[in-house]
Amino acid sequence: NYPEYLLAPLMNQELNPAIEATPLRWTETSGEELKNYDMIIFFGMGLNFTEKQQQLLATLKKPLYVTASTRTETALNTLTGRQREEIAAYLGNGGKENFRRMLDYIRYEVDGKRLRAARPQPPKKIERHPFFHISEDDAFKTYQEYLAWYKKTGRYKENAATVCLLSGNGGGALEELIGALEKKGLNVVAANGMWNLLPMFEVVRPDLVVYQPHGRLGEKAVELLKKYNVPLFCPIKVSQPYGEYLRDQRGMTGGMLSQSVTMPELDGGAVPFVLSALYRNNRGLLEFRTIPDRLERFAELVRKTTDLKCKPNSEKKIAIIYYGSIGREAATGGLGVSESILNVLKRLQKAGYTTGPLPETAEQLNEEIEANNAAFGTNAGNSAGEKAVPRVQTVTITPGEYHAWVEKSMPADLYRTVTERYGEFPGKSFRTPEGNMAIGRIQFGNVILVNMPGAVDAA
């Protein structure tokens, strides 16, 4: 009953041809199939046995061991003390080599099949080094050692940003993420485990941290993120086959949503972006892989974010999408849209962003907003259509431009739901006689304001 994604990387190697290791799904009706195996290892976390299964296991007469058990009734073991210690050591040290050695040990010592079999090698003690790259062998005790190796192998880019991945050791989906970030011209270091977070900040001083969370960080970690002004990106690892995830309209639910999105946001985590899901490998086992189109988008977002830390505010470009306007619309009445936007613009100007001259009052800004609404086609601005406001511009988008954006941002089947509801580009609301799309914007230097369109009925 081990999760397949834990076994998949361990079994992705050449194993003893005399041994067959089979992952079995464990349900309330499981049990009889265990009679076909010579050794049974259960993953104890969350494991349950029905009364019938308990009776079957008690009479099975097979070597049986339950790891990581959280309940007394599932903490079963029929091995000798020595056998249990050895298998626990193989599993505890982890890695492909120890998994292969454990299978040889089970066949030789537990099952007693010794004919033409070499004596199995003992568990290999694996040191847990804090800093690592892709391979299990590329792990280092200090960041200085890692950096020396990183430079020696030609990966280091002078004056480039450094991204730290907080994760467990090993490759898999992590290998693809490291490769994608390095292709963007970034330096990458992986830190093994949350226990290493505090000293890692002091020695690495990363420009951005990527962490696939399950719960909250400690208060000290949050303080360090603030102290060094380090963005924390928290992409999501979906524990479902990718096809199932796409078909499930609920997305993430319950505890997984809370632990992977809500709790990390309390620590300042951003970008809850689905980055990886489960796929079948060539052995038929489910393993985590990054979703190809999403990997590229995420890596580009990381690059742009690190670039922003180095770029002067005067060169940064910002789009503000606002909802509604002052006045008659019930949905936005009393929200102070113009006042809020003007306060933001003044704050940006004070921080050195290029805004050009700003309106003196919220009322002046609202005139421009209503004129923009008219250009944008929302009913709030219909009465302002005759006003001429220099900063209000109509931007034309061609079919080629639009479809290039769509192809880059959403799957084809998802876009079909858009066209089924609103028709083909450019739709009804923003169509020009030439078949392009025209939308309105208000420009203040490097900052533009765009109104989010309301629902449009057939009329």
Report each predicted region and the residues it spans:
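An N-terminal assembly and electron-transfer interface module characteristic of large anaerobic redox
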Residues: 1-459
